[in-house]
């Protein structure tokens, strides 16, 4: 399948040899609404800024750093009027392997994810996000229709991703160092922050409040609730 996909690209694009240097810059999908950098995630206030349209963006530097931004809508077959919204951001380092694959290694404490389910919850789930990624193949070309540089990625299972187009070179990114060192957890201290949703992304206006939560806490919370016989416990 992946071979046929890239053979098709040969017919519609002007192909150039792809190497690590070709990746440098900021790439975004056709809507151009989602772009990495401070217009998507504000690390000072720890909030997302909602784009006008869904999409994704990747940035790569010459010295091996990356940043990614996603804004997606997930269909709800049982209630079509209630799609979920997901915003994701992370950054870290990348390497291009000898077989042409790309491996992304995020800074674990910095990644963020915001999930909105407007018809089942009054709150948006705001959590840390840390997901290593592998792209089995990439090509950089000049798109024959748009006449701009185009990046095609094949995911870990060889499925082609949406093409992205170069919008900035050098890339538009946040600092490549750790942005949230206070988020590091120890056995004695865990961070649980409640933030004013008025300053956060609404994901289509569906979210009224949000929390930065360590996902592991939900397991222990559930065990504790069961042990207490279902007594409601509220704490900050």
UniProtKB/Swiss-Prot annotation:
<dbReference type="GO" id="GO:0005789">
    <property type="term" value="C:endoplasmic reticulum membrane"/>
</dbReference>
<keyword id="KW-0812">Transmembrane</keyword>
<feature type="glycosylation site" description="N-linked (GlcNAc...) asparagine">
    <location>
        <position position="130"/>
    </location>
</feature>
<feature type="topological domain" description="Lumenal">
    <location>
        <begin position="21"/>
        <end position="214"/>
    </location>
</feature>
<keyword id="KW-0325">Glycoprotein</keyword>
<keyword id="KW-0256">Endoplasmic reticulum</keyword>
<keyword id="KW-0472">Membrane</keyword>
<keyword id="KW-1133">Transmembrane helix</keyword>
<protein>
    <recommendedName>
        <fullName>Protein rot1</fullName>
    </recommendedName>
</protein>
<comment type="similarity">
    <text>Belongs to the ROT1 family.</text>
</comment>
<dbReference type="GO" id="GO:0006458">
    <property type="term" value="P:'de novo' protein folding"/>
</dbReference>
<feature type="signal peptide">
    <location>
        <begin position="1"/>
        <end position="20"/>
    </location>
</feature>
<feature type="topological domain" description="Cytoplasmic">
    <location>
        <position position="236"/>
    </location>
</feature>
<dbReference type="InterPro" id="IPR019623">
    <property type="entry name" value="Rot1"/>
</dbReference>
<dbReference type="Pfam" id="PF10681">
    <property type="entry name" value="Rot1"/>
</dbReference>
<comment type="function">
    <text>Required for normal levels of the cell wall 1,6-beta-glucan. Involved in a protein folding machinery chaperoning proteins acting in various physiological processes including cell wall synthesis and lysis of autophagic bodies.</text>
</comment>
<feature type="glycosylation site" description="N-linked (GlcNAc...) asparagine">
    <location>
        <position position="52"/>
    </location>
</feature>
<feature type="transmembrane region" description="Helical">
    <location>
        <begin position="215"/>
        <end position="235"/>
    </location>
</feature>
<keyword id="KW-0732">Signal</keyword>
<dbReference type="GO" id="GO:0051082">
    <property type="term" value="F:unfolded protein binding"/>
</dbReference>
